[in-house]
């Protein structure tokens, strides 16, 4: 029996639209992510469980973990008779890399069970392929950090898909999911077809500056450069209360604040626990809209997906 946990992730991280992603895990040790278990069997079967099992598609062929099994067997060149269990702990359409969690946990668990027939690069390429089928185009900004951990810069240059970016251990990431769903397709459709030359210049400046600040260990500069001129100005209208929450977080003492992926999850970066707790409490009271919403104080998950059973 193999059981794999894949953590939540932040796509874009404000400054790197489609090219930057970060894996996160709560500081209290809670598992914020999906788990997939693989056991030997006479034929394939899939069981779903977990907090958000009710949000999964009813048809087997639409289930991401079933699609993982299909793709894995296709690349393996033979059918793998296994019993799989998806523990769906990630809300769908949350901006926390929910589909990536299932993709990464599913494919990694199958690879471990089969005796590691595929190396890390091959498996990551498979993850990107499947994520592309789900979202309509290949994006690694969730699957790469979810699988490999930490902060990842997506390059897609031949066999080099991504590279790790140094992060700051002192940063705490307050993650607030309001409990509503935002469609990734809708969030992409709202973006302009063309951007001004000034926006392009600013985007390049902020992203290059942020990566430089990370490598040269300048956390204050890195936080100051976490500005999104590509998506946030347009997606804010899809997120009730986001603008007010962002301003409140910064007033309380957040170093930076932004939209996680397509939203509606908000992330806020702090460098001390007292500030993080104050922001988390405010977000719980004012940004979370229902019982499905939650707030977690996290750090970057440097381990990424891992076998836990």
Curated annotation (Swiss-Prot):
Which class of enzymes does this protein belong to? transferase
| Primary location group | cytoplasm
Identify the EC number(s).
Answer: 2.7.1.39
Q: Where is it localised? A: Cytoplasm
Reactions accelerated catalytically: L-homoserine + ATP = O-phospho-L-homoserine + ADP + H(+)
Kindly list the biological process annotations in GO that this record carries: threonine biosynthetic process
Q: Carries keyword Nucleotide-binding?
A: yes
Which parts of the sequence bind ATP? 91-101
Pathway in which this enzyme or protein is active: Amino-acid biosynthesis; L-threonine biosynthesis; L-threonine from L-aspartate: step 4/5
Single GO MF descriptor: ATP binding
Top-level division of the source organism's lineage: Bacteria
- Described function: Catalyzes the ATP-dependent phosphorylation of L-homoserine to L-homoserine phosphate.
* PANTHER family named among the record's database cross-references: HOMOSERINE KINASE, HOMOSERINE/4-DIPHOSPHOCYTIDYL-2-C-METHYL-D-ERYTHRITOL KINASE
Please give the name of this protein: Homoserine kinase
Species source reads Photorhabdus laumondii subsp. laumondii (strain DSM 15139 / CIP 105565 / TT01)
